[in-house]
Amino acid sequence: MQVPAVLGEPIRFVLNWGRRYSLWVFNFGLACCAIEFIATSMSRHDFMRLGVIPFAHGPRQADLMVVSGTVTDKMAPAIKRLYDQMPEPKYVISFGACSNCGGPYWDSYSVTKGVDQLIPVDVYVPGCPPRPEALLHGILRLQEKIAAEEAGVGGVSRPDALASPADALPPRAADSLTAPPVRPPDPS
C-alpha cells in the first residue's frame, strides 16, 4: 500500500521524531572509552534529557550501538553478531580513536583498523578518550541524521542497510566466523 504524498511528509516527520528521541543504547565497551560512556550517562551530563536511554538489556532491544575501545580481530565476530541481532532501523556510533581507526594500537597484528571495516558506522566521535561532551555532540549529530531520513520500507530506514545482502548473515552464521590467524610482526 502506497501512502499518498500529502500524508507522506507528516508520517515521516512523526516516525523520525519518535526514533530520534527514543534511542535505546547498547554499549559495546572494550577499553577506556567505555568509562567515558558511563560518565556521560551519569547525572552531570545526563543524556536521557536528549531522549537517549542508556543500557538496553541487549542488542535485540537496542536502536543504537556505541562501540568504544580497541576492536581486536578476535572480538570482530562478536561485534558483527551483536549488530546483526539489532532490529532495523539500527545506528552505530564509533566512540574514540581506537574504534575509529585502531588508535595507538593501529600497527598491532591483532587490531582491526576501525569498526567500520565490520559494520556501517553513522557517526564518528574522535578523541583518546573522548570527553563526555563529545559523545553528546555525536548523539546530536545522529539525531540530525535520523530527522533527515526518508520513511523506510519494511522498517529499514537506511538505504545502506539493504545495499549488500551478501554481507547479511543468517542468525547463527556469525558464530562460525573465526578470528584470522595471528600474524607475526613484519621484520622490516
UniProtKB/Swiss-Prot annotation:
Residues binding [4Fe-4S] cluster: C32, C33, C98, C128
UniProt keyword terms in alphabetical order: 4Fe-4S, Cell membrane, Iron, Iron-sulfur, Membrane, Metal-binding, NAD, Quinone, Translocase, Transport
GO molecular function annotation: 4 iron, 4 sulfur cluster binding; iron ion binding; NADH dehydrogenase (ubiquinone) activity; NADH:ubiquinone reductase (non-electrogenic) activity; quinone binding
Stored SUPFAM superfamilies: HydA/Nqo6-like
Biased composition (Low complexity): 157-177
Membrane topology category: Peripheral membrane protein
Documented EC number(s): 7.1.1.-
Enzyme class label: translocase
GO cellular component entries: plasma membrane; respiratory chain complex I
Cited HAMAP family: NDH1_NuoB
Stored NCBIfam families: nuoB_fam (TIGR01957), PRK06411.1 (NF005012)
Function: NDH-1 shuttles electrons from NADH, via FMN and iron-sulfur (Fe-S) centers, to quinones in the respiratory chain. The immediate electron acceptor for the enzyme in this species is believed to be a menaquinone. Couples the redox reaction to proton translocation (for every two electrons transferred, four hydrogen ions are translocated across the cytoplasmic membrane), and thus conserves the redox energy in a proton gradient.
Subunit structure: NDH-1 is composed of 14 different subunits. Subunits NuoB, C, D, E, F, and G constitute the peripheral sector of the complex.
Name listed for the protein in its UniProt record: NADH-quinone oxidoreductase subunit B 1
